[in-house]
Amino acid sequence: MSQLTHFDNAGQAHMVDVGNKANTHRVAVATGTITMLPATFALVRDGSAKKGDVLGIARVAAIMATKRTADLIPLCHPIGLTKVAVDFALDEPSSTIACIVRTETHGQTGVEMEALTGVQVALLTIYDMCKAVDRGMVMGNVKLLEKHGGKSGDWVAGA
């Protein structure tokens, strides 16, 4: 197993020096889910929630969050993202919505944290927009699905 990189020899937190790393194309894909009551799911699916287009607003929130990750996670590097894609998969039998966020950059450090942050904020936005009718929604299963590029190469969950 690799060493933790955000601590120096004295155990103090520090931001990792990526100055000597090569600029490479980097990609990360993350996902997470929110499960709700069937009636709430129908409101979201049909676009008839009182606050408006839940998934449209959640998509924009996810994109905004990916761009602000370094402001939220103390030791993350500010990254110039080159692409952010946000998709939703609706599973009616379980009243579950999956959010999938793909982030890309050409730089010296990965974009995993940006993808994960985008997923979390999308799910929180769905919760916020639907909580008036369903406070029991459950968010979960947030995870990195894959990452590509950089010194450590490619990684795919379950591979």
Curated annotation (Swiss-Prot):
Any Pfam family matching the protein: MoaC
Q: Which domain of life is it from?
A: Bacteria
Does the keyword section mention Transmembrane helix?
Answer: no
Name the reaction it catalyses: (8S)-3',8-cyclo-7,8-dihydroguanosine 5'-triphosphate = cyclic pyranopterin phosphate + diphosphate
Q: What is its EC number?
A: 4.6.1.17
Coiled-coil regions in this chain?
Answer: none
Q: In which pathway does it act?
A: Cofactor biosynthesis; molybdopterin biosynthesis
List UniProt keywords, sorted A-Z: Lyase, Molybdenum cofactor biosynthesis
Q: Does the keyword Protein biosynthesis apply?
A: no
Q: What class of enzyme is it?
A: lyase
Active-site residues annotated for this sequence: D128
Gene Ontology terms: biological process:
Mo-molybdopterin cofactor biosynthetic process
> Where, in this chain's numbering, is substrate bound?
L75, C76, H77, M113, E114
A GO molecular function term, named singly, is: cyclic pyranopterin monophosphate synthase activity
Q: Subunit details for this protein?
A: Homohexamer; trimer of dimers.
Q: What does this protein do?
A: Catalyzes the conversion of (8S)-3',8-cyclo-7,8-dihydroguanosine 5'-triphosphate to cyclic pyranopterin monophosphate (cPMP).
For this protein, the record's HAMAP family field holds: MoaC_B (MF_01224_B)
Give the record's family classification: Belongs to the MoaC family.
Protein name per the record: Cyclic pyranopterin monophosphate synthase
Print the organism lineage. Answer: Bacteria, Pseudomonadati, Pseudomonadota, Betaproteobacteria, Burkholderiales
